[in-house]
Amino acid sequence: LGSLMKLMVMDGQGGGIGAAIIKGIRSTIGLDIEILALGTNSIATSRMMKAGANKGGTGENAIIQTSLTVDIITGPLAILMANSMMGEVTAPMASAVTSSPAKKILIPLTQEKVRIVGVSSEPLPHLVNQVAQILMEMQ
């Protein structure tokens, strides 16, 4: 069990993107990866747990502490942006994710007033498949 890659999936609000990522990873990689669901709120964490995460944590301190111990962090781009997700992502959360030594695989979906040039707008299922593909290549 100690050799499993540790993946932190972070999301906020309703947790839909995080849940989709977890379902996609479980359907492609299966149980060969440890998935930690980190929500900015309990609804997001709960939804990600139901999608198949191994463990879950909620809130600023859980996100800060977990970001130091995982191999990879994934979630929507907004997890890097302080005050995003209607203020749910605090500056310390965004800083912890950004500063973490973990590799980051981010989904370029955001409701913020940010647009990433050179990134095509693909539907979420396609983006989730790309995340799973990258993770399989990293194993």
What residues fall within each predicted segment?
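General beta-strand structural signal in soluble alpha/beta enzymes
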Residues: V9, A37-G39, G56-T58, G75, ...
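SAM-dependent methyltransferases
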Residues: L1-M8, S27-I29, T69, V128-Q139
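Short glycine-rich anion-binding loops that position phosphate/pyrophosphate groups of nucleotides
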Residues: Q13-G15, A78-A82, T110-E112
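A short helix->loop->beta-strand "cap" motif at the edges of active sites that frequently abuts
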Residues: L31-I33, S99-K104
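N-terminal beta-loop-helix "entrance" segment that forms/cooperates
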Residues: I33-G57, V114-V119
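Glycine-rich phosphate/diphosphate-binding loop of Rossmann-like nucleotide-binding domains
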Residues: M5-G39
